[in-house]
Design a protein with these regions (language model features):
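N-terminal positive-inside, membrane-proximal cytosolic segments immediately preceding the first
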Residues: 1-36
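Short solvent-exposed coil/turn linkers within tandem alpha-helical repeat scaffolds
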Residues: 93-102, 116, 130-139, 166-175, ...
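TPR-repeat structural position
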Residues: 75-76, 82, 119, 155, ...
Length: 235
């Protein structure tokens, strides 16, 4: 065996010996640490399967009932408040707010309140809703929140939120529509230069969106909607 090989074996043996020495020296501390990890992991599983998961399942069940009985029939008041033994969205959001289903209940409650014209209450629920990184849901929630801000005359917030929704969605046509809503509000605020910039951005970034496409009516080809708004503010 070569001297280099002997040296390598010595290095390995020395490393192992040091490791064994460390284990012997700190045996009590290491065992304590392992037990602590086991307790944490065990506690986590106990929480998930003994408390968290049952709550999630129950919240999903209650949300499904409320959605089927009231949302589908557009009975927004009962959807919010419930009826008899059926919990409404407000109660589900309050009792199970830490669960995914309880979180969705906040979003649905916000939409129901908006439909009922209770925009300030709707805003509270929609602001409290967590999108949890889902781009589709995030864009829809931001769009709903922007509409609530607009209805509540919080126009600057509405514009900013429409723009955020446009960035969040991965559907170009929706991005164009959300930005268009922001442009309309800016026009309403007499901020024509800013509105024009938004309209020009729509035309440049989303040329295939319906709002940017020319429309045919019989033998007549109409200009794209966005072109009309750009022309109006360019004069």
């Amino acid at each position: 065996m070569s001297k280099q090989a002997n040296n390598q074996n010595l290095d390995v043996n020395e490393t192992l010996a040091k490791s064994e020495a460390i284990i012997v020296k700190y045996k009590k501390q290491i065992i304590t640490a392992i037990v602590a990890i086991a307790v944490v992991v065990g506690g986590t599983f106990a929480y998930i399967y003994g408390y968290s998961k049952p709550r999630e399942d129950k919240a999903q069940e209650l949300l499904g009932i409320a959605m089927q009985k009231y949302i589908m029939t557009q009975d927004y008041e009962k959807a919010l408040k419930g009826e008899g033994k059926t919990l409404g969205l407000e109660a589900i959001a309050s009792k199970y707010g830490s669960t995914d289903a309880g979180n969705v209940a906040k979003y649905e409650a916000g939409l129901c309140l908006y439909q009922l014209g209770k925009t300030k209450e709707a805003i509270k629920y929609l602001e409290d809703f967590s999108t949890q990184g889902d781009a589709t849901i995030s864009a829809q929630a931001l769009f709903a929140l922007a509409n609530c801000y607009a209805a509540d005359k919080q126009l600057d917030k509405a514009v900013d939120t429409f723009k955020k929704a446009a960035k969040e969605t991965n559907v170009p046509a929706r991005s164009a529509e959300y930005l268009f809503q922001a442009g309309l509000i800016l026009e309403n605020q007499k901020k024509n230069d800013e509105a024009l910039q938004v309209y020009q951005q729509i035309k440049a970034d989303y040329p295939l969106a319906p709002i940017c496409s020319r429309q045919q009516q019989g033998d007549v080809v109409l200009d794209a909607i966005i072109d009309k708004y750009i022309e109006k503010l360019s004069k």
